[in-house]
Amino acid sequence: MNNLIVQLETVFSDIILNKDLSSALKNIKDFLAYRGITHYDDRLEEVESGYNLMKDYMSRGYKDEMRESLYFDMLRKLYTVAFDSSKNIQIANGQYYSTAAENSSKINLNEEAISEKFEGYIQDMAMISLQPDSSQRELEEKIIHEHQNYLSVLFDAIVVSPYWNEGISIKMTETLLNPTIDVSDILNLLSAITLSSTSLFDYWRFKTLYNVCLGSSDENVKQRAFVGWAFMLNTYGITLFKEAKNMFAEALDANSDLRRQFYELQLQVIYCSDAEQDNENIQKNIMPDLLRNGNFKITRSGILEQEDDSVSDAINSDDDDKKMEQMEQSFNKMMDMQKQGSDIYFGGFSQMKRFPFFLKISNWFAPFDIDSPYLTSVKAKLGNIKLLDSLYKSTSFCDSDKYSFAFAIISILDQIPDNMREVMNSADFFGMAYDDTNSHTSTYIRRRYLQDLYRFFKLNHYRSEFNSPFIEAQFVDKKIMLLSDFISYEEFSNDILSLAKFSLKHQRWNLLNALLSHFKLTDALVKEKLDYESLKLHYYLKGALLMHRHMYNEACEAYKSLLVLDDSQRMGLDRKLLNFNPATEFIDSPVASIIFENSKESVLKSYALAALRSGDNSLATKCYQILSEKNDAFKYKLYHALALIGVGDVDSALSILFSLDIQNDDANVKRTIAWALLVKADYEKSERYYDKLILSDTIVADDYLNAGYCKWILNKNSEAVISFKNWMSIKKTDDSLREAFNSDHNILNAAGISNIDMKLMIDIVNE
């Protein structure tokens, strides 16, 4: 919830979460009385009278089948009062809101003839040609100026407007679907509705965007309405309105492609939210190579070497080839980022939003138009240079960045040499741009608009007065549209699991956790509603998340559940017989009932690793034995040996390890042999292995620790102290050695090292 309405938090909680009309009435009356606000008294009295009448009927013993429905109607009426009160607080406390309210005070959306105003503008522009030539330009500038002012004021009026009613919704829908109105104006007004709907839910705004999305034949209008409508799915208060949920379901039924677009939009929002991180990556890992290898020109068709007559070119041709290769790799990395949806230009343009044009909030969402009155001075200064035409056709930049570029270029135009001005006239001036041949598709249009929105929510001076719909690390679960209360796991399982797979692939652990925490498995989902493949994927993703969080016992349970499902599916068993535990969300089944020999290798290896990490060496041994028989993989044999050491079968482990050591010169094999020998109490041989590891390039921290054990057991205490100190220098915590000794207590005790010896050694090392 926006911090500007925090004073109303109790009221909203009463209404939305607790559905407590009595408490909500009391709290909002107290709140309004404290602030001296009286113009909601009539609306409050209507709700209170209705509630008192309901109580009176109930006390007399009347049964009313409509009681629950009427109760929720009153809750919604009270919600609109709280909504409007929050707008008042924003106007009282927000710099933009207060200015916008003052500027638009003469506009009442209930009474404003919006369509007529815009149609009048079109007619006035058409009539200019009938005027004398000498006065046409002046008249045109006057009409355009008045129209732009009205558009800006109307934009502000929409943003600060209170809760809408059906009349406003119908009027706005008719305006936004009016084919005679300039599309640029329609797009601007749609952004105003979106901006006014980022915190609290307004059913009539939601319905307006829905009707425009489904009713418009213009893809730009359709997508801008769709983005605003989808963002509203996460706004506070939406759960009060069953009509909104029905509308969402109807939209999916009416448009078979809408579900795909909804999921695609979710991914685009995620990529767009990464713009700052992507910019940091470009600055650190890509731009240095591009700048170092500056003797090349980047064009749309690729990277070309510039002409240079220096003798050094012939002498150092190999170096040039390497530079060319490095530059191509860096350039291609950046282009690949853009193709997958990354906002690669955010960093460059983030410093170019201080021009007067951006002082008006509505201009942040204005479609780029060469004939815009804001570009009149730009065109005059450019003269015959066709930069604006190239900029308009460019498919790389969002509209906001195109305006930034236009204003920035004229500020340095006088410093640009003539030959560079000629290049600016070429169609290839924006050759670095990714040539998106699908620039009129819904995907491209949405991405460009999302970038406009992202720049506003990240860079605008008044951004703190709005609740950004973009994802922040600490608020992942609040910004994911698929986590809306309107989304059910049963209905959206493919999309939810696809996003979860995406999260795992890109190691977005917070997002994966948010998804799996929100969409919990139930008895009905496991035994009936979800298909086998969806269930198995859920458990696989759950296991991966738990492994990442070092919750190895729970990961074992997740992978075991997957294996049980695999067996059940293969044998055609009735899923209703599964013993699902709703508290843990796992399927309870004894390990002995699982047929490991028939299990898929990819699943069994995950289960085996979880068992090994959890310390269940007996289970890990069994799994790796079967995996080694299925696949003669090096890693399976190595982990099998580790598990055997864990169960005390060191000789069998060494047999495997010595064979691996002959086949592969691998440090991890030698490290495991050293550990096995230490466990076996063959301390001298173990010491020799650790001594070699410490002198190698493949040393790891625990080599020092285990070498220290060998030295200590062999009574080489001064060398042991050095090894432990080296290990401590890497661990950098005073308790590390104590924890290590406790963990390896059995090995040390078996070698005759007592608890007192351990305490003394810790003190010596820490001196």
Language-model features: locations:
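"A position-specific structural signal for the A-helix of alpha-solenoid helical repeats
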Residues: 10, 30, 46-49, 188-192, ...
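TPR/TPR-like (Sel1-like) alpha-helical repeat modules
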Residues: 33, 230-254, 559-567, 709-735, ...
